[in-house]
């Protein structure tokens, strides 16, 4: 930032250093961040420095559970059609792009069968990635697909494009199991349109 924009620092009062600071991640070097910020503030004491650590507070805290509705193979591409949408429910996957881990899968190696995940909207680009299932397992219609670490951005950037329903929001506790927090329906879509 200093190399490219340092000549502007005398003209501004604050500097936003952006988001994505995963301070709660086990491998994050907090001491290094503190050192960098202190050194920067010593050089530019008039600047108010802002960090956006948003996802640090939701790191690896939420899953999105989808169901396989259909399997399609076309031109050598294997796709699992899901009851969720990348465009509507996981826009960060398409925009950033962010590739979430899926429980029971891994990055496909040479020669492994690859599966693309397809969304349920009519948007032509509503699909993402390639995953291989552990142990060469063949996914089936009705299987649950568990996208890990999906609470950041997913909750705040969703859309109901063409009336695609949002997944329900649930909280899990080991002592009491799952508890429904919110179920979305047509009235939610209608309310957004008026």
Language-model segments: residues:
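Phosphate/pyrophosphate-binding loops at sites that engage ATP/ADP/AMP, CoA/4′-phosphopantetheine
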Residues: 1-9
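Solvent-exposed, well-ordered amphipathic alpha-helical segments
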Residues: 3, 14-17, 142, 174
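Short, well-ordered coil/turn segments that N-cap beta-strands
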Residues: 9-13, 45-47
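Metal-dependent catalytic neighborhoods of phosphoester/phosphodiester hydrolases
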Residues: 26-31
